[in-house]
Amino acid sequence: MIRKIIFLEMLLLGIATFLYSQDEISKITITHGPYLQNVGSNEATIVWITDKPSIGWVELASDGNGSFYAKEHPRYFDTSNGIKNTSTIHAVKVKGLTPGKQYRYRVFAQEVLKHTGYKIIYGSYASTDVYYR
């Protein structure tokens, strides 16, 4: 009886370890960036690269006293013709910025596991720290 219990515990531990390691292997990461490109007086393009095909977006807020994480911010998606791009290279052009004003931003990527027609299956997220510019 003791052997059966030990065997069952070892089996469950092995399965849990395998599943955890598979989850860690499959997580998406942002490998490069974010970089500011084509900075104008009232616009900027934010570019970053991921290790897996994904959709991407930027959360942007004006520089303030409160924590960036305290509330939700508008999302600016990497799109073409209104459709979210699935890529490893992401670029989001943010318009309507006020000259001389500082902004805080953070980039995100969500892995696209499968994209068939209008059916999209998403995977895990990756994000950066908050940047001040």
What are these regions (language model features)?
Residues S21-R133:
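Acidic, histidine-bearing metal-coordination/catalytic regions of metal-dependent phosphoesterases
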Residues M1-D23:
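Bacterial Sec-dependent N-terminal signal peptides
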